[in-house]
């Protein structure tokens, strides 16, 4: 009896020590050094023509390393500061000077739900509407998905279904693969819409065999652009290993009412 009590007390002490250690990792109050670094970042980023961007990137990298162990207020202020540099009118750059923006997008993606609002807002910002910013905007969508913030599932799905740019459609649909941990009903809704659009793109690219038909060519190019990322997203969300709109359509018709989180009878590939 005493040995059982002794083991229980030992376990309690160990667990208590673990909890105390975990709690100790979260600072009791905001760090003045973080505040100073954020002020420095703002100053560097606002220098005309991006003359101090390399120094600003160093500051961002230094802060990102500390993010997980920051006080919650510091984490929030950090994400906000990054977002303001990304979206702010005083930090305009030419596309060939985009490294600071790419660094920020990466950092915001790693900041989870604190970073997602700024990624979504920057994607819609007039600052990046010119076609030369397409690839950067695609990166915004990619890292918005990596935040795993469920508030932006609809945002990403809408871009995948409605955006007319092939790159952005592809990136938005591909970013949805990060939501494989969502409940089944959410994943099914995403898959239903993505599969339907995938099939539509495929069908429009095969209405005739005329290689000179510019409309058919446009749809074929679109299918080539979305195929890899959309297949990857559907595979993650369904836990299947199919490829191509025809196979996904058959899978959906056969299994839309089934529990995908349990082993399904394998579909023919």
What are these regions (language model features)?
Residues 1-10, 16:
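Bacterial N-terminal signal peptides that target proteins for export
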Residues 15-23:
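C-terminal segment of classical bacterial N-terminal signal peptides
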Residues 22-41, 257-269:
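Sec-dependent signal peptide cleavage junction
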Residues 26-29, 52-73, 94-113, 134-149, ...:
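Structural detector for internal amphipathic alpha-helices that build alpha-solenoid repeat scaffolds
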Residues 28-44, 69-91, 113-126, 149-162, ...:
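Amphipathic alpha-helical scaffolding segments comprising HEAT/armadillo-like alpha-solenoid repeats
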Residues 46-54, 84-99, 110, 125-135, ...:
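Short coil turns that connect the paired helices of HEAT/ARM alpha-solenoid repeats
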Residues 96-98, 205-214, 261-269:
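Charged/polar, low-hydrophobicity segments characteristic of intrinsically disordered regions
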Residues 235-269:
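Terminal, low-structured helical/coil segments at or just beyond the last alpha-helical repeat
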């Amino acid at each position: 009896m005493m040995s059982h009590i002794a083991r229980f007390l030992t376990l309690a002490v160990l667990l208590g020590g673990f909890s105390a250690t975990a709690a100790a990792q979260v600072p009791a109050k905001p760090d003045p050094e973080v505040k100073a670094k954020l002020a420095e970042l703002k100053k560097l980023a606002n220098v005309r023509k991006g003359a101090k961007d390399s120094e600003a990137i160093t500051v961002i990298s230094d802060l990102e390393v500390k993010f997980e162990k920051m006080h919650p207020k510091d984490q929030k202020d950090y994400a906000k500061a990054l977002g303001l540099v990304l979206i702010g009118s005083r930090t305009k750059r030419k596309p060939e000077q985009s490294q600071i923006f790419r660094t920020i997008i990466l950092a915001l993606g790693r900041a989870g739900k604190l970073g997602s609002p700024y990624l979504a807002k920057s994607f819609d910002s007039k600052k990046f509407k010119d076609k030369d910013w397409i690839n950067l905007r695609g990166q915004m969508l990619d890292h918005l998905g990596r935040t795993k913030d469920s508030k932006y599932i609809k945002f990403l799905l809408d871009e995948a279904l409605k955006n007319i740019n092939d790159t952005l459609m592809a990136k938005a649909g591909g970013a949805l693969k990060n939501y494989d941990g969502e409940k089944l009903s959410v994943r099914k809704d995403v898959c239903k819409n993505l599969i339907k659009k995938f099939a539509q793109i495929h069908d429009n690219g095969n209405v005739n065999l005329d290689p000179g038909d510019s409309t058919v060519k446009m749809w074929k190019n679109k299918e080539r652009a979305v195929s890899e990322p959309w297949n990857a997203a559907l595979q993650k969300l369904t836990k299947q290993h199919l490829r191509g709109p025809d196979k996904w359509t058959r899978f959906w018709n056969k299994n839309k009412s089934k529990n995908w989180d349990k082993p399904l009878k394998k579909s023919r590939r």
